[in-house]
């Protein structure tokens, strides 16, 4: 396996907590909820249709494994799994990536609000990686009736590399435990 891993052209190797021969999972720069992570094929391709059958199988096997561990670690009862497959679907980084967002009962009073948050998160992803830890001045959101108030996009600061590396190291421990059981 290559030593450095790239999410498109952005190095993310130190944020990786799970890796197979063909896929990898890493912590999110600007998570919507705690535990929001990304799973990617190691080969950078923009669309699902560009993956080989082996890459596609490995990607979704990895998504399932990461989802199971993330739900356990974050005490979640469900997850949102999301892909923006192409520019017209909202993809801003030209590298297939699957969002896993662990969910708990009543974390949003309107369950579908997570999708608008995902769109906002994805819409700024490339510029966040390009500008490091600069803040993003996003659009104002309409008021919502969420039980858990999600901070406005501009208030969700990108995490530091140190914060993401620490979370990745913590999560790696759970995957080591899972691998020992297999």
From Swiss-Prot:
Which residues carry out catalysis?
97 (tele-amp-histidine intermediate)
Catalysed reaction(s)? P(1),P(4)-bis(5'-guanosyl) tetraphosphate + H2O = GMP + GTP + 2 H(+)
What PANTHER family does the record point to?
BIS(5'-ADENOSYL)-TRIPHOSPHATASE
Q: What is its EC number?
A: 3.6.1.17
Q: Which parts of this chain are annotated as the region Disordered?
A: 135-161
Does the keyword section mention Nucleotide-binding? yes
Question: From which residue to which does the signal peptide run?
Answer: none
So what does this one do? Asymmetrically hydrolyzes Ap4A to yield AMP and ATP.
Task: Please tell me which stretches of this chain the record labels as motif Histidine triad motif.
Answer: 95-99
CDD domains reported in the protein's UniProt record: FHIT
Species, as recorded: Schizosaccharomyces pombe (strain 972 / ATCC 24843) (Fission yeast)
Which Gene Ontology molecular function entries are recorded, alphabetically? Answer: bis(5'-nucleosyl)-tetraphosphatase (asymmetrical) activity; GTP binding
Gene3D superfamilies to which the protein is assigned, alphabetical: HIT-like (3.30.428.10)
Record-linked SUPFAM superfamilies: HIT-like (SSF54197)
One GO CC annotation = cytosol
Q: Which UniProt keywords apply?
A: GTP-binding, Hydrolase, Nucleotide-binding
Q: Which GO terms describe its biological process?
A: diadenosine triphosphate catabolic process
- List the protein's name: Bis(5'-nucleosyl)-tetraphosphatase [asymmetrical]
- Mark out the compositionally biased spans (Basic and acidic residues): 150-161
Q: Which residues of this UniProt protein bind substrate?
A: 28, 84, 90-93, 99
Residue ranges annotated for the HIT domain, each copy included: 3-110
């Amino acid at each position: 396996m290559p030593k450095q891993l790239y999410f498109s052209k952005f190095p993310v190797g130190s944020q990786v907590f799970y890796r197979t021969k063909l896929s990898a999972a890493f912590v999110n720069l600007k998570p919507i909820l705690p535990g929001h992570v990304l799973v990617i094929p190691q080969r950078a391709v923009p669309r699902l249709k560009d993956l080989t059958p082996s890459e596609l199988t490995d990607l979704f096997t990895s998504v399932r494994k990461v989802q199971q561990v993330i739900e356990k670690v974050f005490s979640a009862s469900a997850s949102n799994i999301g892909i923006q497959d192409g520019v017209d679907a909202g993809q801003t980084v030209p590298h297939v990536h699957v969002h896993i967002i662990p969910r708990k009962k009543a974390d949003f009073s309107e369950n579908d609000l997570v999708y608008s948050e995902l769109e906002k998160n994805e819409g700024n992803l490339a510029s966040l990686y390009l500008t490091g830890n600069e803040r993003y001045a996003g659009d104002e959101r309409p008021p919502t009736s969420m039980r858990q108030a999600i901070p406005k996009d501009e208030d969700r600061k990108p995490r530091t590399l140190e914060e993401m590396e620490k979370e990745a190291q913590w999560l790696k421990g759970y995957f080591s435990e899972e691998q020992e059981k297999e």
